[in-house]
Amino acid sequence: WDELMQLEYLMNKFGDRDLEVYLIHAAEWNVMGHKRMTERSVVLTASESGTTPEVLEAVKKMKEKGIRVYAMTKPEGPIGQAVGAENCVAMASDHGSGGCEKGYYLADCFGLRLLNRRGCFPKFDLFIEQTKDVWKDMLDIRKRFEPRAEELARKYALADYTMFIGSGALWGETILYSMCLLEEMQWKRIRHITSHDFFHGTLELLEPGVPVFLFMGEDECRALDERVRAFLTSGVTGDEDYVIIDTAEYAIPGLDDDFRVIVSPWILSVLTTDRLARNYELVTKHNLKYRRYYHQFDY
């Protein structure tokens, strides 16, 4: 769900005015449906385990309605079997083990290719060419960020409560890291909020000793992030525990300017879902694979 938010953003950014793109939660679709979904619709879903019950139920219903469904999942899993192996591509990574940027890459290639076929993203071939060797750059970014990841983990991994702020193309990754990695895998108490919503109540929760992470991207919403940064650095709250992570500081050389916004969630994933989470794990001594309830029994 949160991993596909950036794709919804990109398809709306680069698509034409007649293109309809919706990000729908499978559990909600199972009980509410969606009036704009027809047999002419194309659906992309994802399941790391291949068994997510809400997704499996939704996929089966969609197939019965004649809707075209593609999945990033194990072809041999229940969801893969429901979709059909020919419409599946195996997930290239899993949360907590690094490499989530590869999942972004696969989803982006799918969505941007659809746009290209509509005449909306003419630079698709250039995008593929310029990102084919991006994985070395991602490794370099990991190495460059590692000392800071170690420092941040030592300082904040044991905090009672932490706030995360993001926007635009980075909002999905902001949720993924704070909820899936820190809440689910580290059992940390977290608040995630968009840069535009931050000033509608959440700002009142800032006080000395509350760590605040601001993730800054390279899209139109950067102006909203800048407003948050100005507030955090003003000193008015007395809270000096703010962290600003700006994907522009880790820009990949040789990329067309139009592609920087596309790869910004990949970069943030490398920094947070991979390296920062791993360093939190070392400090908390809490294995990222520990679960009390998730996948432990039916609920």
Q: How would you name each of these model-derived features?
A:
Residues 1-39, 157-200:
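Anionic-ligand anchoring segments at beta-strand to alpha-helix junctions in alpha/beta enzyme folds, i.e.
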Residues 1-124, 130, 215-242:
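Glycine-rich phosphate-binding loops that contact phosphosugars or nucleotide phosphates
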Residues 23-25, 73-74, 189-197, 239-251:
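A generic structural motif
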Residues 42-46, 161-168, 211-215:
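Short glycine-rich or small-residue beta-strand-to-loop segments that form or flank ligand, phosphate
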Residues 76-88, 201-205, 250-260:
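Glycine-rich, charge-decorated loop segments at or immediately adjacent to ligand/cofactor-binding or catalytic sites
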Residues 95-96, 112-195, 288-299:
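Active-site phosphate/pyrophosphate-binding segments
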Residues 172-242:
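Internal helical hairpin/lid segments
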Residues 228-299:
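Phosphate-moiety recognition in structured ligand-binding domains
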